Amino acid sequence: MQRIAMFLAILGAGASAVLTGGCKSPPTQSEMAAYDYGPRPENYEKLIRDYLFNKLLDPGSAIVEFKAGPRQLFQQETTLRPLRYGWGVCVWINDKNTRGVYDGPYPMVFFIRDGKIVATNGGPDDNIIGWRYARTGCNELGAPFWTP
């Protein structure tokens, strides 16, 4: 009985940390301005397509839609994600699964600085937290993503 109580206490503490760990107030303009975003990337579409080539199951038939950006994007550090900033680009991707069928689009956010992708949210190798950050990032960039 004591083991069950201890397990439930640990489970409750972990769930509480996950649910509240990602919550922070939005960054202020001065916080965002304190970082060097570098020059606005001109070749962002090529950078992103090259990045995705090794990540997607079928990159040749994947549908990649550039929805918003590049715009300066700042993501505060939380217990779940490190600080991320750069030129943000929201992309919606529809890739084929292992059966050769399109699964439906999902959002990704790319952070680009000094001509390189320095971080991403969402995507095939990210977790559910990253997918949530991708939706939030796309929303901030002006391309809200929702699942019908």
Describe these PLM feature segments:
Residues K24-P148:
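Cystatin/cathelin-like cysteine-protease inhibitor module
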Residues L19-G22:
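C-terminal motif of bacterial Sec signal peptides marking the signal peptidase cleavage site
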Residues M1-A9:
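Bacterial N-terminal signal peptides that target proteins for export
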